[in-house]
Amino acid sequence: RKHILIYNFKVYLVMVFCVAVVTIFSKLLGSANSVVGVTVLLAVLVLRQADFGIKTSHGLLSIMGIYAILIAGPRLSNMVPPFAAFLINIVCIMLLMIMGCHNVIMYNHSTFVLGYLLLQGYDVTGQDYVLRVIGLLCGMVICMIIFYKNQKNRPYRRTFQDLFYEFNINSARNRWYIKLTFIVSSAMLVMNLLNMPRAMWIGIACMSVCLPFSKDIEGRAGKRGAFNIVGCLIFSIMYIVLPKSMYPYIGMIGGIGVGYSAGYSWQTVFNTFGALSIAAELFGLKYAVLLRIGVNVVGAAYTLLCDRLIDKIYAACTGRKVETA
């Protein structure tokens, strides 16, 4: 019972901290920039423990590079036609992968690429963008301080430049970079060409399914599709049953659920709450749910298909057998 109480305390403590950080950013930068708080929060939580596989002092350069992309990339991609945005996404996501994801087991892509997609999906202009830049710069400084404090004794000898010098298409790690970059960018391109809203949803779905090891992708794709449907059904029931005054708290309920979820499946279920609570207000419940289910099912299937196709193309061009484990 004592361990359960401690666990519950930790979950709620983290939740309170997360809500406080996002609220502070929203108050200072405006509600349109609450996503900045989410992006910085995710980075802080990761950089407390994760590293980049290079010297700590050079890791600070990676953080600066990552935040430079988060500041410029999403805004630029929203200013140009779909094909130009596709090229910008290719460059930005690839750089995020190279600078932030060398240590594959840290799963840093689920933080930095996710932040990029969120900032792109919740775009702002004018004074709001100026405030966004200020917020991200402050977040960068906070992340650098926390990262250096926690990681300064790491024994790595690899440098920031080595992340680029060591790039090799025959490396399984670098092929994963290419796969994820192409799959996410091309999926969003199709959404933009079809003039469908929430292109970031399919980008996030593809990113989540495109794991470093191909053998893991099929299982992840099935869970992504199936448990998004479960999440949408639960959300729909809550949205219909609860009074409108409770709608703003559905996302928070999802956050608590994620905190209690030990596995990917139920994390996927509860992650739908926050996304749909916003989309349902914009598009209506029916369209938002159908869009969410369709985008995630198609995105998961598309990622699985592209992963196998890219491996076959690589094997045919190089004569090398692709390792799946």
Predicted regions and their residues:
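Short glycine/proline-centered loop/turn elements that form peptide/ligand docking sites
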Residues: G274
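Alpha-helical transmembrane segments and their membrane-interface boundaries
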Residues: R1-S110, L114-L233, I237-I253, G257-F270, ...
